[in-house]
Regions:
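Conserved class I S-adenosyl-L-methionine
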Residues: 1-42, 46-54, 140-165
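Class I SAM-dependent methyltransferase SAM/SAH-binding core
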Residues: 55-102
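Short conserved loop adjoining the S-adenosyl-L-methionine
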Residues: 103-108
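A short, conserved alpha-helix within the catalytic core of class I
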Residues: 121-134
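Short alpha-helix
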Residues: 166-181
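Conserved Class I S-adenosyl-L-methionine
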Residues: 185-249
Length: 249
């Protein structure tokens, strides 16, 4: 049976296990910001809109340089985490708004840069048009380019006979930009994210990943399979192989 959880509830649930901001410079987010600087994109002194900001992994890093940042998201739990971490970091130039991007009303507020990273909030031609209109200077879009493979989850999918979803939204955006005669710059991003989870968190991530397709028999295979992956300390290390593209226009 398909899971009928609405998007807000879905992302509130994801917030329980979702990665959150860290100030380390040895992170994917820090690397992306450095790559953008090398591509002549600076957030320094800019008014930034972060669409689908989630827990604020990018939002807080951008706020270190920007004049102001407004993050939008549909999940109250994601925004709660964002503000917890913003308070710790002393990020008083950051605000948030709980809404879908379709319902977002800037109320006359102007933005220099619109930022959107692997978010379902920006997926359609209307969304592409809108971020373009909202950005006074630049749009920075990070999207999937055909690969998002978790070794842990793919082992579960194989055992359960589940066909993994293909994440590949970048071609749709490129086609739209070409139709609008909008020049853009593209930067490929290939990463392997290594994350270690305690047993409860690993099991929660697996159950979340299969909840739309899992039979009772499949659910029963999760715990034994995780047993085979656990280290001596009971923790499970996962490697996520991803391929994305940054599109800047």
């Amino acid at each position: 049976m398909k899971n009928m959880m609405n998007p807000e509830a879905k992302w509130d649930k994801k917030a329980l296990t979702y990665p959150r901001y860290t100030s380390s410079e040895d992170t994917y987010e820090a690397k992306i910001i450095r790559t953008l600087e090398g591509a002549d994109v600076s957030f320094k002194g800019k008014r930034v809109l972060d669409v689908g900001c989630g827990s604020g992994k990018f939002t807080l890093r951008i706020a270190k340089e920007a004049a102001s940042v407004l993050g939008t998201d549909i999940s109250s739990q994601m925004l709660r985490i964002l503000h917890e971490d913003a308070e710790k970091e002393g990020a008083d130039n950051l605000r948030s708004l709980k809404c879908t991007f379709d319902d977002f009303d800037p109320k006359g507020e102007k933005f220099d840069i619109v930022f959107a990273s692997v978010t379902p909030a920006v997926r359609t031609e209307e969304h592409f048009r809108r971020v373009t209109e909202l950005a006074g200077e630049r749009v920075v879009y990070i999207g999937w380019a055909g690969r998002k493979e978790s070794e842990m989850l793919y082992a579960i999918y194989e055992r359960c006979g589940i066909t993994p979803k293909i994440f590949n939204d970048v071609p749709v955006l490129k086609e739209w930009l070409a139709k609008q005669n909008i020049p853009y710059k593209t930067i490929p991003v290939e990463e392997t994210w290594v994350r270690t989870y305690d047993r409860a968190k690993a099991e929660a991530l697996c159950m979340e990943a299969i909840e739309d397709n899992a039979s009772g028999a499949c659910i029963k295979t999760v715990a034994p399979l995780l047993d085979t992956m656990a280290g001596a300390d009971g923790r499970i290390t996962d490697r996520m192989h991803v391929k994305m593209e940054m599109i800047i226009w």
